[in-house]
Structures are given as C-alpha cells and as structure tokens.
C-alpha cells in the first residue's frame, strides 16, 4: 500500500458541523475503498490566492492516507461532484513524517519551538529578516 497526502478546500461559509460531516464522508469513502486515514489536520479558514467558484476564502483540510491507487481515483470522483468542495489534490509520498505540517495550527505542532520554526521557514524561503530591512549597502547602481 502507498501513502498519499490529500488536501481539499471547502467553502468558507460552512459551519463546524458541516465541515465535520464532510470529513466523516471523506473518511467513510477512504474506508470503503480499503484505505486508512493516517492523520488529519484542519488548517482552518484562509484567504485564497484567486477566486475559486466565486469564493475568496476557503476552509483547508489536510489528510495523510494509506491505500491503493484506485482509492485515490474513487476519492477524486466523489470530491469532484461534492458542492462543498472547491478544490482538491492528492500526491503520492514515499514515507510519512511524524511532524505536523508547516501550515498546521500551533496546537497540533506542540509548544516547543513554534517561534523558531516560523523564523526558520521565513529564512528558508528568502524572506527578509531584521538585519536586512533598510540596508542598501548591497545594491548596485546602474550608471545611467
């Protein structure tokens, strides 16, 4: 059996009970196809990068699944016709990490190292840190 990361975005106007109902349907579909939900993370309501089905926000849900390729095919068919689901994506992964994903809420990550993790992520992605702000010493003037 293979492992898969599954993420889907739900309409932001859904209540907590409706989100739980969609997650229950998703888990039932996984179990019906012989798969297993290894981990679930609710990332919450977030701003979308662009309009998706006339929505500017969505509720992100992340799962790690174990199952066969046919399971993913069945899930895509069912998520594609679900009116509450805006977008979805499944990716096959080699191994499962015990660490929570970077977008997981802080409660799921644990108390230790939250600030350090956030700072590491910013520097990893080339974001400016305090000593870079306002420095113009490394700019090159274009002699026009």
Curated annotation (Swiss-Prot):
Pfam families: Ribosomal_S6 (PF01250). InterPro entries: Ribosomal_bS6 (IPR000529), Ribosomal_bS6_sf (IPR035980), Ribosomal_S6_plastid/chlpt (IPR020814), Transl_elong_EF1B/ribsomal_bS6 (IPR014717). One of its GO terms (molecular function) is small ribosomal subunit rRNA binding. Residues 99-144 are annotated as: Disordered. Residues 106-117 have a biased composition (Basic and acidic residues). CDD domains: bS6 (cd00473). SUPFAM superfamilies: Ribosomal protein S6 (SSF54995). Residues 128-144 have a biased composition (Acidic residues). GO terms for biological process: translation. HAMAP family: Ribosomal_bS6. Binds together with bS18 to 16S ribosomal RNA. Belongs to the bacterial ribosomal protein bS6 family. This is Small ribosomal subunit protein bS6. The gene is rpsF.
